[in-house]
UniProtKB/Swiss-Prot annotation:
Expression (tissue specificity): Widely expressed. Expressed in the heart, brain, placenta, lung, skeletal and smooth muscles, uterus, urinary bladder, kidney and spleen. Down-regulated in some types of cancer such as lung cancer, choriocarcinoma, head and neck squamous cell carcinoma and oral squamous cell carcinoma.
Gene Ontology annotations of biological process type: bundle of His development; chaperone-mediated protein complex assembly; lung alveolus development; negative regulation of cell differentiation; negative regulation of transcription by RNA polymerase II; positive regulation of gap junction assembly; positive regulation of skeletal muscle tissue regeneration; positive regulation of striated muscle cell differentiation
Record's keyword annotation contains DNA damage: no
Organism: Homo sapiens (Human)
Annotated GO CC locations: chromatin; cytoplasm; nucleus
Name of the protein: Homeodomain-only protein
Amino acid sequence: MSAETASGPTEDQVEILEYNFNKVDKHPDSTTLCLIAAEAGLSEEETQKWFKQRLAKWRRSEGLPSECRSVTD
């Protein structure tokens, strides 16, 4: 059975995405997003979707509304 499913990235891809989310930028610009997508072997759309969902998860864990952009909003 393959590690990759139709519904999401592989473990290796998630590791790359998580590293960039935690160490590089939670709000990557389009150029950075393109570079992360290339590094992970995903499309820009898949990468953008992953970051959007991961950011909402992070906000919830921090007790913030999932739609706000920062602590000051």
